[in-house]
Every structure is written in C-alpha cells, then in structure tokens.
Amino acid sequence: RLYYHTSAGIVKALDDVSFTLHAGETLGLVGESGCGKTTTGMALLKMPSPPGRVEENSQIIINGRDIVPLSDSEIRKNVRWQEISMVFQGAMNSLTPVYTIGKQMLETLREHKEMSDKEAQDLMEEYLGYVGLPPEVLNRYPHELSGGMKQRVVIASGLFLKPKLVILDEPTTALDVIVQAQIINL
C-alpha cells in the first residue's frame, strides 16, 4: 500500500497490489499514463514521491524478507541496487553532468561492494560491453554522449550489482529498435 497523505486527506495510490515473481520470470505492468506503474516500482524500492509513503501494514517480501520495516539507510545500503534496482523512465537525465560516467558508476559500486580498483574497472567495462558501449565511455561526461548512450549507461548501472529484481520503467525509450532488442534480451 502506498498512500499520499495530504492536507485534503489520504489518497490511496496503491492499495492491495500483489504479485509474485520467481527467479528468471518477467512481469509487465501495462496501463494508461498515471495509472500507477511507476508508483508501483517506487513503492518496491520504498522511494515514493512526497507526501507518499509505503504504509506500515504493507509487505514487500524480497527473498523471504519483508523490507517495509527496514530503515531508509538499511534500504539504501542493503536493498537498493543489490536486491532491487530500477531503471527510471527518462533515466538518461539521472546522470550528474559534472562527473564522468566512470566516477558515477564507481560511486554506486563503492557504496555497495568492496573491490579493488582493477575489479571495479573490469566490472564497469564488462557491463558497458553488455549494453554495446566501449570502455572509453567511462572517461566521458554525460553531455558527450547521445541520449541512447546515456540510457545504456544507466541500464548497465542497474545491472552490475546483479540484483534479484530489476524494475525497468520504459527503459528503451531513447534507443533504436536494434539496440532495444539487445537490451530486452539481457
């Protein structure tokens, strides 16, 4: 359950939404704009837009563990990116313009995993390769990349910690048809 608590009252954005996914399964949410697809993804990450919040009597079970009671710092450190990652609609706009792609990807890795510089470099290059980007992209700034390249950087970042659940919110919008097919088959 995700409710928005406003001065005009409570708005029940998500109420009694339930689904089960097993390893290797894919689930697609389809609906008109504003029906709650993105909100569902945000709820799974416990990241609702204010004044929304995941209600305490809700359950979000990941690998047998309910993450609703976890604190924001526990979610940030142990759940996001490792258990669940989300590639947001318009994800290419989530890159910070003043840092190189490598610095931004490395920051995510360092926050969640201990590894040597060489291991981190190899992992970042490996996942950029999966989405069809050369290692040189790590030394570039976001403004030096096309929209499709930025989208693929964000997709690679959403995958490189091997989360159990990957939420893709229109992940291929900025990609051409051939690259879309490659990404969907990852």
For the regions a language model picked out, list residue spans one by one.
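Conserved ABC ATPase signature
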Residues: Y141-L145, M149
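ABC ATPase NBD coupling module
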Residues: D66-S85, K103, E111
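A short, flexible loop at the N-terminus of ABC-type nucleotide-binding domains that lies
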Residues: L2-D16, M47-R53, S71-R76, V98, ...
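Conserved ABC ATPase "signature" region
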Residues: D66, E107, K118-E136
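The feature captures the beta-strand-to-loop junction immediately N-terminal to the Walker
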Residues: V30-G31
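A short, proline-enriched helix->beta-strand linker immediately N-terminal to the Walker B motif
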Residues: F160-K164
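Conserved ABC transporter NBD signature motif
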Residues: E55-D66
